[in-house]
């Protein structure tokens, strides 16, 4: 069994810490990776963090994860609400999937209330800031370990 967890991030998350800090905070994607790597290492796992502004590239990473990862944490960002293609790719992945959002999408614009990814996700975290990623990694570690 692989002990790698893929952490996939969608559009504009490369600007984390710079874009709308009143919503997304001041920490960066590098901070997310560092914090997730620490949590995973405590449990004997490793992480591979990836970000893309391009839907097809995210799908390619999900396909790669089929052979290389025990679980996926995904923040599809705006693709959450629009991408049946990402949903279909996640359906082809057999391990656990946790959907993670930094902000509480249910307190925001109504178009953000629907998630295609939730149809596949084993759990959803929203509104916990980047701590949500750490919680997601803890849960994925547990699920990958059979818990």
Curated annotation (Swiss-Prot):
It comes from the Bacteria. Its EC number is 4.2.1.10. Pathway: Metabolic intermediate biosynthesis; chorismate biosynthesis; chorismate from D-erythrose 4-phosphate and phosphoenolpyruvate: step 3/7. It catalyses: 3-dehydroquinate = 3-dehydroshikimate + H2O. GO terms for biological process: amino acid biosynthetic process; aromatic amino acid family biosynthetic process; chorismate biosynthetic process; quinate catabolic process. SUPFAM superfamilies: Type II 3-dehydroquinate dehydratase (SSF52304). InterPro entries: DHquinase_II, DHquinase_II_CS, DHquinase_II_sf. The active site is at residues 24, 101. Homododecamer. Catalyzes a trans-dehydration via an enolate intermediate. It comes from Cereibacter sphaeroides (strain ATCC 17029 / ATH 2.4.9) (Rhodobacter sphaeroides). The record marks 19 as: Transition state stabilizer. Substrate binds at residues 75, 81, 88, 102-103, 112. The gene is aroQ. This is 3-dehydroquinate dehydratase.
């Amino acid at each position: 069994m692989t002990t790698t967890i893929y952490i996939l991030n969608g559009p504009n998350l490369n600007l984390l810490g710079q874009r709308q800090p009143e919503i997304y905070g001041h920490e960066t994607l590098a901070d997310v990776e560092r914090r997730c790597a620490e949590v995973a290492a405590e449990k004997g796992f490793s992480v591979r963090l990836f970000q893309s502004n391009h839907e097809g590239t995210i799908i390619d990473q999900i396909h790669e994860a089929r052979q290389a990862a025990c679980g996926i944490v995904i923040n599809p960002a705006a693709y959450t609400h629009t991408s049946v293609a990402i949903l279909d790719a996640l359906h082809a992945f057999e391990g656990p999937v946790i959907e993670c959002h930094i902000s509480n999408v249910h307190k925001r614009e109504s178009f953000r209330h629907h998630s295609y990814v939730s149809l596949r996700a084993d759990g959803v975290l929203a509104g916990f800031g980047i701590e949500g990623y750490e919680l997601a990694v803890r849960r994925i570690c547990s699920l990958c370990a059979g818990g």
